[in-house]
């Protein structure tokens, strides 16, 4: 007999750090384009899996010396390699008990909606009453409805085990498993360090409110376009300034910001990434704050930030070029 406890034990054995279970009826009232019941109408359980972002994968950016590791080992490698591997094996495990399982994983590259929920117009419903493919299950909301954690002001998902340091995978199954209670939000105390240390996208004033699973939730109204540029190390050039940081990828008017040492935006790692900011506000500042309060179960013998944070002054000449003259 397949039980929730067996599923959680198998998930840990196969590489997940967290596993929690919800029921599809918790999505009642969700937008059709984000409702998992349209993907598997006979689903009895929704399973959320958490995969830690190693604190060490952020170390190179914190020191300003090794930037690619977070984008590879803490970001793209998790999303494109590690999470799919674990999810596929978990789906096989459940199907060996005779229950169909869909390993949605972390990615939805063919989704019908954009980052703010608007239809992109690239597909149409196959019949009346159905949403346009592909339906995209909102991962952070799935994590919340499965009882894994909460959505912080930054819009990043927080858990008592790792704070903001995890990525989420989702699975649907026809197996009926005992659900976990929805997580009572309490980790985010609205310190707003995520906003004050973000290089350009998190608002401390504007917010989005939604009632989900019986809870009134609120997070910042994230400017996704600014986040796209800022987390890659870019900021908008003023009139008269050069804006060539992303010109090699067809985007003009962007200059390097103080959080990047690179003259040009680096290439992608595992299909996406270029996460030059290393979650400066939404992950690192949040993590430091929650660790200082003792709210994170994954504890370390030393604090993460050990000296003043660096900043690149692009108005000054490159010291290596000066040394070579």
Region locations from a protein language model:
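Non-catalytic, usually N-terminal nucleic-acid engagement modules in DNA/RNA processing proteins
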Residues: 1-88
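Short, solvent-exposed secondary-structure capping/transition elements
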Residues: 58-59, 102, 295
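N-terminal and secondary-structure boundary signal
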Residues: 1-14, 30-33, 112, 164, ...
């Amino acid at each position: 007999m397949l039980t929730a406890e067996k599923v959680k034990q198998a998930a840990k054995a196969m590489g997940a750090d967290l596993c929690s279970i919800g029921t599809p009826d918790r999505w009642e009232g969700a937008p059709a384009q984000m409702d998992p019941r349209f993907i598997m109408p006979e689903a009895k359980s929704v399973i959320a899996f958490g995969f830690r972002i190693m604190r060490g994968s952020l170390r190179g950016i914190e020191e300003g010396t090794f930037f690619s590791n977070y984008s590879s080992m803490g970001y793209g490698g998790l999303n494109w390699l590690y999470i799919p591997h674990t999810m596929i094996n978990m789906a096989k495990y459940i199907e060996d008990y005779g229950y169909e399982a869909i390993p949605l994983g972390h990615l939805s590259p063919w989704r019908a909606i954009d980052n703010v929920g608007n239809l992109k117009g690239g597909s149409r419903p196959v019949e009346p009453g159905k949403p346009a493919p592909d339906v995209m299950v909102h991962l952070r909301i799935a994590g919340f409805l499965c009882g894994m954690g909460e959505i912080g002001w930054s819009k990043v998902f927080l858990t008592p085990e790792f704070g903001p340091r995890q990525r989420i995978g989702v699975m649907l199954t026809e197996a009926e498993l005992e659900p976990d209670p929805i997580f009572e939000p309490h980790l985010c105390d609205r310190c707003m360090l995520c906003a004050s240390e973000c290089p350009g996208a998190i608002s401390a004033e504007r917010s989005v409110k939604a009632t989900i699973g019986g809870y009134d939730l609120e997070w910042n109204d994230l400017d996704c376009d600014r986040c796209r540029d800022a987390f890659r190390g870019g900021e908008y050039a003023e009139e008269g300034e050069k804006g060539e940081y992303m010109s090699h990828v067809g985007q003009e008017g962007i200059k390097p910001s103080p959080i990047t040492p690179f003259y040009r935006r680096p290439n992608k790692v595992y299909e996406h990434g270029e996460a030059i900011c290393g979650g400066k506000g939404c992950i690192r500042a949040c993590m430091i704050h929650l660790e200082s309060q003792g709210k994170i179960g994954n504890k370390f013998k030393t604090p993460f930030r050990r000296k003043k944070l660096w900043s690149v002054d692009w108005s000054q000449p490159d010291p290596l070029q000066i040394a070579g003259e």
